[in-house]
Amino acid sequence: MAKKRKPNFLVVLIDDLRFDELGICGHPFMKTPHIDRIGHEGAMFTQAFHTTPLCSPNRASILTGQYASRHGIIDNVARDAHSHRLPNYHVILRRLGYETAHIGKWHMGNSGGPRPGYDKWVSFPGHGSIIDPILNIDGDERKYTGYITDLLNGHAVDFLKKKRDKPFALFFAHKAVHPDAFQAADGTIDFTDGGYRPAPRHADLYKGAHFPRRPNAL
C-alpha cells in the first residue's frame, strides 16, 4: 500500500485589511484581483470573526488555536519572552517531519529574531518599515533596499520553489496594509513619521478616488 502523503500548509495573513475592502466583498473601487481569485476558486467564510481583533493577540490565536485569555497575549505590549513559549502549531509540525517557515510580520514582542519551531525565519522588528526595511533572516539582521511587500514575496517564493523530500508549512504574514508606525514597549504608537506608502508602480492606482474617513479612524 502506498504511503499516504502529508499535506502542505500555506497561511497568508494580511495586516489591517477589513473584509469589506476587497473587490470580492463588494467594495466599489478597491482592486484586489489576486485575493478575489482565491475567493472565487476556494471558499469564503462570510460569518467569520475574531474574538480579539488586535495585532498581537490575533496572531497568537491563529498560531495556537487558543483564546487570548488562555495564551496570555492580550494586547500589543512587547512580550518577546512570552512569544518564545507559545504552543505554536509549527513546533508540532516540525516534530512530525515538516519543514517550517515564518516569513513576514511576527509582532508578538518588538524583536525580529527567530522564534522556536521554524527552519526558515524572515521577519523584522515591531511593525517594520515599508521602504528599505530591516530584515532578520535566520538571525542575521540588516537593512535591505526595496519595498517590503516585494522583498517578503521574494523570500516566500524561494521557499515554496525549494526542492524538498518532506512536506512544508509556511506562515506568510505581510506587513501590508499596515502603515509605518513606531510602537513603544508599552504598546503606545507614534504615527509622526508614519503613514502608508504604496509601491511606486501603484502610486496612481487610485488617482482621483475619494477615500472617506471613517468615524473611528485615528
Residue ranges and their predicted role:
Residues 11-12, 19-102, 112, 116, ...:
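Active-site segment of extracytoplasmic enzymes that catalyze sulfate/phosphate-ester chemistry
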Residues 88, 151, 155-158, 171:
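Alpha-helical elements of Rossmann-like donor-binding domains used by nucleotide-donor carbohydrate transfer enzymes
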Residues 31-32, 86, 115-118, 149, ...:
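Amphipathic alpha-helical segments in well-structured domains
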Residues 73-80, 140-148:
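The substrate-binding groove and active-site-proximal loops of carbohydrate-active enzymes
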Residues 3-7, 16-29, 125-144, 160-166, ...:
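Active-site-proximal cap/lid insertion segments
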